Amino acid sequence: MVEQLTQHDPRRIGPFEVLGRLGAGGMGLVYLARSASGRRVAIKTVRTELAEDQLFRVRFTREVEAARAVSGFYTAAVVDADPRAAVPWLATAYVPAPSLEEIVNECGPMPTQAVRWLAAGIAQALQSIHGAGLVHRDLKPSNVLVVEDGPRVIDFGIASGVSNTRLTMTNVAVGTPAYMSPEQARDSRSVTGASDIFSLGSTLVFAATGHAPFHGANPVETVFMLVREGPDLEGLPDDLRPLIESCMQMDATHPAAEPRDLQAQLAPHLFASGSDDSGTASAWLPVPATAMIERRRGGRRTARRPPRPRPRRLRAAPQGPGAGHRLAQRGRPAFALPAVLALAAVRRVRTAAGPSAAPDGGPVQLPGAKVPIGPGRRAGEGRGAAAAAPRRRDRLGPAARRSERFLGGHGPHRTVPASTLRPGTPSPAPDRWRPWRFRMSNDVWGTPVVSGDLLYVTSFEVHALDVGNGRRQFKTRDVAWAMAVEGGRIHASDGPSLYALDAASGAEQWRLATDAWVYALKADRGTVLTATRGGGVQGWEASNGEKLWEVTGAQSDFETAEAGPVIHDGTVYLWQDARLRALDARTGLERWSYPIGDAASCGGVPVRVTPATDGYVYVAAGTRVLAVETGSGPVRWHFEAPAVFLSPPAFAPGPAVTGGGVYLADYLGTVYALDATTGKDRWRIATEARSSIEPVLVAVGNVHVGSGSALYTLDAVTDTPKWRFAAGGDVVGAPWWRRPGPLRLGGPRALHPGRGGRPAALKLATGGEITGSPVAQAGVVYACSKDRCVYALDALKGTGTGNRART
């Protein structure tokens, strides 16, 4: 979408008049411009830090000359460039067409023949690019435009020009982790055209399935999956597997297919006798996709719909002889479940008594409940629409046992991740603060941190933004995969090193090399805690980086930030040698340990720990929940469930009669309310299969849990269902609550009390799905979004800025 120019954008670049913004790429901003003759071009500019690198300028100049020589029907031709300008730029022919990413997000996965049609065109484009001596290095769905007569590959030249500069010498692999090759992730400076062929296979997987072949919670986890595990090919049609396997060679020493070989392989399928050999999109693509192409060609855009939900799948390993014979076998996924448990989850949901489907917008009658769960109004629906909504009472069959009631749904979908209670304060005064938005050059991930007058977010580096106006005060020089802010310092790691910066100025205070890659980092009361690949856990003095202690042999089955050790109130809790151990945070000396079991005995899922304010730590270990006294380690009680827990327990203080207790949901979606004193099961309600690793949300006597595309609210004392809100799509991120405002979802929505106590929706003013968890402080909501923006929103109204954004 073409956006209006800001006061910081140039009005002319070289001989071109700048008309608007097209977006932001990995190397810099992209503008729509017009030549003196009226020809429209797309101009890619280069980020300041790259422009200051003389090695980059030399290489970029050479690559631009090579890019000018690229000719081919399936590429966007280079029109002009100035590598020596203060801000280097490259202009290519503007193609008014949607990207492959946009088409799949809005219209769904493509048919087999359409994927082959795309593959043939992209392969021919790569043949032209490689013939000019270039390697694309960033082939992905957003860099493939789809027009009526075939795909167009864009953005070659800049990505290849950045290789061998200081950007790649700070452990940043050029390219997009979800689509790059393993050899590019290891060393992007020495890749060949075979790497582009691998990326072509990854792009085709997205086109055919709707999901990337590699996906993690953040880029570093995606790279880890890429080099250690192999691609996720779930949903890929069998007819396309030979094509994908010929592209995605996990072993770089194995000869990859050449572009001309792929074209020869595809030709018999595309132009067989009796087939439509026109070669146009209408011959291969579904009607919605061709309509979208036509609208874009005519300069019209429909209101953008959110991307189709992509469930986070828990996959069993391939079975049978020859399974994935040319693709490396996947290792254990970060939170993989044993196949028998995955099968049990499917059976549990599909065989629930009676029909399980409940219409969106209609009430759901729980067996044994006196009233149905009422639907909340969706965003944008007025009272008339709400009144016209169907009022069917779809019963779910015979009454289940009193202790288990099945809520309506459509099978095992990705659920609404939840977080623990976050206190809030009144809405900001309008005369002192206005909503703002800050656009990053790269993806933003993780949960933002507010400390004093600054907001800290991670987008490769740590960026410090003024909470009042969104202006960037500074950013770190180096990459930060993990970050914690505590005691006036930013503690961060780029993987092989750990460093501390002054939180107010960004000035470096200390830096040291670690013995292994840091995958988790936390800070508490002057101690920095890190977990490294291979089972290492270290404690560091926050003021100077002195190593206080180190232990080895900690669990290494689940090396993710969520499964890492926990530090709270001077105590470190870690999983080591099949025992849960409590260590002194300053000395590393063991205070107590408990035999929790190894990964196999814990159901193949990580142990999750929640330290609470009542002097106990609540532990979820496979199918078990334990309450352990934090001082000396005796177990207060033990609870056993029929399914494993992926998320940690949530603790609510107070007696059970007021909603106090321990709440959590297992993998099958059953929500449990446990008495914090005895561990007895006060009640349980089963929803749909749940793969969220976030805890349920307990606030003001209510338990909020996501199930598929709906959010259910249950009374924490009696388990009485209060309402059901149909979100209109799977909700991502974590819901949170602030007193006295609305309940907020991880996606761009908030729920306000409506008629009869049922919720009405208010859409938060963000431009994409929320990543991490939003944070509320002083009446402001801070959230990071998949549109590469950081938002500051009014916590009471959920409103934000318009289209303008600071950069």
Curated annotation (Swiss-Prot):
Post-translational modification: Autophosphorylated mainly on threonine residues. Some phosphorylation on serine residues. Autophosphorylation on Thr-168 is the major site enhancing kinase activity towards AfsR, and is regulated though interaction with KbpA.
Binding positions for ATP per the UniProt entry: L22, G23, A24, G25, G26, M27, G28, L29, V30, K44
Biased composition (Basic residues): 297-315
Any one GO molecular function term: ATP binding
Matching Pfam families: Pkinase (PF00069), PQQ_2 (PF13360)
SUPFAM superfamilies to which the protein is assigned, alphabetical: Protein kinase-like (PK-like), Quinoprotein alcohol dehydrogenase-like
Active site per database record: D138 (proton acceptor)
List of residues that carry Phosphoserine: S71
Record key words, sorted: ATP-binding, Kinase, Nucleotide-binding, Phosphoprotein, Serine/threonine-protein kinase, Transferase
Catalytic activity: L-seryl-[protein] + ATP = O-phospho-L-seryl-[protein] + ADP + H(+); L-threonyl-[protein] + ATP = O-phospho-L-threonyl-[protein] + ADP + H(+)
Chain spans, region Disordered: 292-328, 353-429
Domain Protein kinase: 16-272
Residue positions, PTM Phosphothreonine: T168
Top-rank lineage group of the source organism: Bacteria
Low complexity bias locations: 353-363
GO CC annotation: cytoplasm
Entry's EC annotation: 2.7.11.1
InterPro entries: Kinase-like_dom_sf, PQQ_b-propeller_rpt, PQQ_rpt_dom, Prot_kinase_dom, Protein_kinase_ATP_BS, Quinoprotein_ADH-like_sf, Ser/Thr_kinase_AS, WD40/YVTN_repeat-like_dom_sf
Assembly and oligomerization: Interacts (via the N-terminal kinase domain) with KbpA; the interaction prevents autophosphorylation of AfsK.
Alphabetized PANTHER family for the sequence: PROTEIN KINASE RELATED, SERINE_THREONINE-PROTEIN KINASE 36
Family: Belongs to the protein kinase superfamily. Ser/Thr protein kinase family.
Name by which UniProt lists this protein: Serine/threonine-protein kinase AfsK
The species this protein was found in: Streptomyces griseus
Encoding gene per record: afsK
